[in-house]
């Protein structure tokens, strides 16, 4: 256990905990995004409530929360296990942020940032999967769930280290857990479609 690894892990959690959507909504939208729309702090809800601009900024911010600490881990730690630990804790920071009493987002954008660093060649496949499903069935949540489910398969087939495959499995399970309300609405036929956003 290295000092660098411990510091990177703490920094990753704090980075993941930064509530991008909440901050942007309060700065430019004068609203608490947690009290609007679906109540989620992520880019989709910010887009629906406050428009494309703030939605896009929230997406970028949440992706960067995943990129920066994992890139630092790759540079300073180098060890695949430490990189995976930092990545997972960063992801947990978004889901359970200390700054919001551990009530965070669903993790898709931050997961995207993480995999842009550790498996950049697999990200286009995940994005294509997301787009095809989301456009076909008109549900952002279904696209996100599909991409999350397929990422471990992509990594495994491409021969990535097992620690990264396991990381993607763990993150995927948590993404499904955080989308349990969406899954319920999808089954009931009451999930909000893209065209209605």
Where would I find each of the regions flagged by the language model?
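Alpha-helical transmembrane segments of multi-pass membrane proteins
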Residues: 12-15, 90-94, 130-134, 155, ...
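Membrane-embedded alpha-helical segments of multi-pass transporters/permeases
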Residues: 21, 70-71, 99, 135, ...
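Interfacial segments of multi-pass membrane proteins
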Residues: 47-50, 73-76, 93, 108-137, ...
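Loop-to-transmembrane alpha-helix initiation sites
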Residues: 122-124, 140-147, 160-171
